[in-house]
Amino acid sequence: MAAQLEQFLVNEGQVDQRAVTYMLKGLQLESLSDFASFWTSKDYENGVRDDIISKVAPFNSDLSLPAAKLQVARLRAAWRKAQGKPSAAVPLQSAKPVAGSVVTATKDTGFCEKTGLESGGVAHGGALNAAQVAHLDEDAFKGGLHRPKFDSEGLHKPHTSGGKTYETGFHYLLEAHELGGKNADGGFGGPLCADPFSPEIEQLCQALVREAQDDKTLCFENFTKPCPQLTKKQVELCKGFDYGDKTLKLPCGPLPWPAGLPEPGYVPKTNPLHGRWITVSGGQAAFIKEAIKAGMLGAAESHKIMADTDHHQTGGMYLRINQNGDVCTVDASVAKFARAKRTWKSGHYFYEPLVSGGNLLGVWVLPEEYRKIGFFWEMESGRCFRIERRAFERNGLMIMRQATEVAGKISFVFYVKVSNDPESKPIPLQSRDYTALAGLDNVPDSLGNPYTCEAKDLDYPIKRDTWLDKNQEEMLKQRSIVGTAFAKCCDQGFEAHDNPKGGALTAAHVESLGKENFKNGLHAPNFHDDGLHKPMEAGGKVYSTGFHYLLEAHDLGGKNEDGGYGGPLCKDPYGKEVQSMVENLLVQANVDTTNAFDNFKQPCPQLTKEQVAMCKGFDYGDKTLKLPCGPLPWPAGLPEPGYVPKTNPLHGRWITVSGGQVAFIKEAIKSGMLGAAEAKKIIADTDHHQTGGMYLRINQYGEVCTVDASVAKFARAKRTWKSGHYFYEPLVSGGNLLGVWVLPEEYRKIGFFWEMESGHCFRIERRAFPCGPYMFLRQATEVGGKISYVFYVKVSNDPGSKPIPLQSRDYTALAGQDNAPDNLGKPYKCTARDLDAPTKRDGWLDTNKGAMLDQREKVSKAFAKVCEKGFEAGDNKLGGALNAKHVEKYGDNFKNGMHKPEFHEDGLHKPMEVGGKKFESGFHYLLECHELGGKNASGGYGGPLCEDPYGSEVQAMTEKLLKEADSDRTLCFNNFQDPCPQLTKEQVAMCKGFDYGDKTLKLPCGPLPWPAGLPEPGYVPKTNPLHGRWITVSGGQAAFIKEAIKSGMLGAAEANKIVADTDHHQTGGMYLRINQFGDVCTVDASVAKFARAKRTWKSGHYFYEPLVSGGNLLGVWVLPEEYRKIGFFWEMESGRCFRIERRAFPVGPYTFMRQATEVGGKISFVFYVKVSNDPESDPIPLQSRDYTALAGRDNAPTNLGKPYPTLAKDLDYPKKRDGWLEKNEKEMLRQRNIVSSTFRS
């Protein structure tokens, strides 16, 4: 029997043998029946993960890794499959009726009289029926309508139904979410698709999502047609409207048809929508997010619910469609819709009551066989959202793609058809054309074009929607409960709640910092009289310096209600996944030239010393005063306000995932708040902190925002501004800031801010965008011509704080002058009148004026500025990316981020001394340097993806791969058979003494020819497969020594001695740390060969590398496909070109990268294994050397004379010099001389 179980798990379940062995020996499962009955249907999803995979190596090292997730998914599928086996028991949990409840059916209709749902069927599956809800309260379903009686305080309170108490009403809705979607056996599959949640379908969905995002054939001209919306007045007119009365017209007038909607008339021939469909993307997680957006759920509750429901499948969302030509009855989840089914006809309005108590009017049109296009009015908001559903066959399955557009943003959900039988019954057709069209035929669309329609209900003369009629009172009650669920109030500028761990900034948070430091909602700390560098006491606690106090204040108000930083949209903003994305985004940002103010090239205004002096002592609290320096000029290039965002994309809580405390400390040093010695001490004290603490809580309502931010910089926790209008901020430093935000489009805001004490203006752009499952906000700040980037991730759609009233400072900042000009003299449309006029004073500032002046004096005399060297900041001597601690012992051999060792004047074969240590030869020194920067943080080579790259398992794989590589004939450059270019002796001589640091010079030898057979660039990788840390598992030191002998750097006698000395070393030391973002990569590699530790390149563009030997290298990498890169490299001292191909691929649980290098017709292979998805190093800005290498010539030819499409212009033009090389030119020339005279080749 055990053998039968093993055979089933391995052959049918494709479960890993290690997991199977544990089940047989560890859990002592002896038969298929044992496996099938080991968990209940309620527990198996968690069970296979917690009881098996979490106990089996290597999966238990990180259950979030793809390999572990795959095994969990396969075991779940195997357990479900085992339920159908003859020897397996089926431990399904049937719902139990409440005592006294009876399920009765009407003989004629087949519907239950009490619930209005279908009678018959089983409790654990099938179409929604009376048996499935018999365990709930008697009145949870009546007349076919779902009307749960939630707690009067809202859905976040516990809810009891059928004797069972749910933690919240939302937990109840989650259970209701799946009602009616399962098959008769309690599963989701069916005859057309047995397992809709299999890994194969998950992979298919990922491919379909990528295809969908590139599709430009969506309805409404790819959703570019304008979408109608009701005015506030129209929404108000419909308040209290009786949607149950079919004889009434909408009081707001007819709803406009969306422009671009096709007309009905087509009648499908094959009924392709008919059947049962299960969601295979979206599901419960998406449902929770939507509920948060809709105000049904707050941040703390959603966080808890997400944790409770992690074990659930994606599914639960479903469609049961009875299609008969152009008429459909559709069953869908009762968690959102109040009733389980509705029947509609193509081109006619239908009505839906929502569980939230709201009202929806919508239309589906079937313009062709496999497509339906719809739009839906949410009458409480006046918004219209548009949808397209498209059915198609893929891999033997029928898929339906749903594209939903709300306010210009398109999202996709996919369904798979699991059965041609919807397993539910149709209900009679009714329509709401008369009401929705307000009795008017041929109502126009949103562009004024008449649309063929008749304002008469299809079920006329029926006068009332009886289902709604029976439940009107309950629906109104639900709407009230949902609307008031999470209301909070504001108290003297702080939120009124008593959670000391997290939430918006409140009195409970600041109590420990001393009430005297927070007054009237203003942060006014009492620093030491001598400045911030002196100790201070607050709330009975003594801080080493005022800055230590500010660091603690820095993250006040940014945490969630549990005291962490995450939220329902992003649980771990400091996890590897998000941090990896951020590193890629930083690389992309550094090459972006689309920033505001013409990429910040427009001149930035600045006040003169005289104007700054005029404003000294100005009373910024008095809103009736004009600035004595005259109106502040608008920065040239600022867009004008007027656009009103439709979707409020900034609304929510955002956490900084780059920058944070370390960046805050650096900024404090720059601004003179903190000196170097103090900074080192503080950084040491705060290393244990997360990056975060910096945060934004934004309440957005169109063009008006209330923003909560760190009180470490701003004296008050929140401010409200309107697009295009000045607001005022007192700073903790005692300074004064006047600024403006403009919202020129949906996902972007552009601002500028005047620091009135210095007269400086700094400009900012914030841009929101999705990346993977997350929403990021990129902040680009320009000060003095330098652009820096900070990234935020949205962790919750709930800001967790409340807005405060709007005020502005237009009169003061514009000195009473309308249409004040920008700094180029061009008038900017504006009115110099405060939005909150006739308010005369800023009361908050007025109350705290004395404290602010005192703070300004203390900050101004604190410290001076410092600057850092050119290696990554870090203090880990054992490992990590190359940092100052690694190279500290090598003294002046590392300067300005460059490796420039001082070898013996007679050559590398002679002894040398570095940092007090004597090396037998320069080459022994280089061998030690060879490993710098390649190790993990613990000083080893492994990582989470491969713990032991030099273990027997990986080495056996590598030996096999080396043998396979020798017989591979699919290498680049036509298997390296295409001729390889080479410079002539004359060309090499021309380049002697060339200044490679000058980016404005052309190579004197003419353009370097492209190697024949090189693919053209243009492909942009989607998954960044090269991103991470790679360790060499073949080649390494031994290969490095051999190459040194060949190149003349080392003779045979010395080589024999060195090989004997280094035999005890691992193969490794050679490594790659790659930060990949699409077709741009920053690569860290060994400083034993390359003089600098890292370089950034873009596919198809030349980059330059100075070599430790003193030579110069110009090369190109091209990324022609997802897992491959092809390159060539010119050694300018020899004139030789060597060609390389790197190819990444999975083998077993590992990802390998094979490097094929061709020099002089001979091919050699080196293999790397990826040990971590985190490169553990930072990217640097992109630069290129196209102009120099191509000698200023576009479309330079290959060595066979064929033009290659190129542009001879550097990507970082107009930058004129390579600064790193410039600082080290003299030393590089010296090294070249020493290396060249070492040995005979």
Swiss-Prot record:
GO CC entries: cytoplasmic vesicle
Annotated organism of origin: Lingulodinium polyedra
InterPro entries: Calycin (IPR012674), Dino_Luciferase_N (IPR007959), Dino_Luciferase_rpt_sf (IPR044902), Luciferase_cat (IPR018804), Luciferase_hlx-bundle_dom_sf (IPR044903), Luciferase_hlx-bundle_domain (IPR018475)
Subcellular location: Cytoplasmic vesicle
Residue ranges of the region described as Luciferase 1: 114-465
GO MF: luciferin monooxygenase activity; oxidoreductase activity, acting on single donors with incorporation of molecular oxygen, incorporation of one atom of oxygen (internal monooxygenases or internal mixed function oxidases)
Activity regulation, free text: Regulated by pH: upon acidification, at a pH of 6.3, dinoflagellate luciferin is released from luciferin-binding protein LBP, allowing the interaction between Dinoflagellate luciferase and its substrate luciferin.
Protein name: Dinoflagellate luciferase
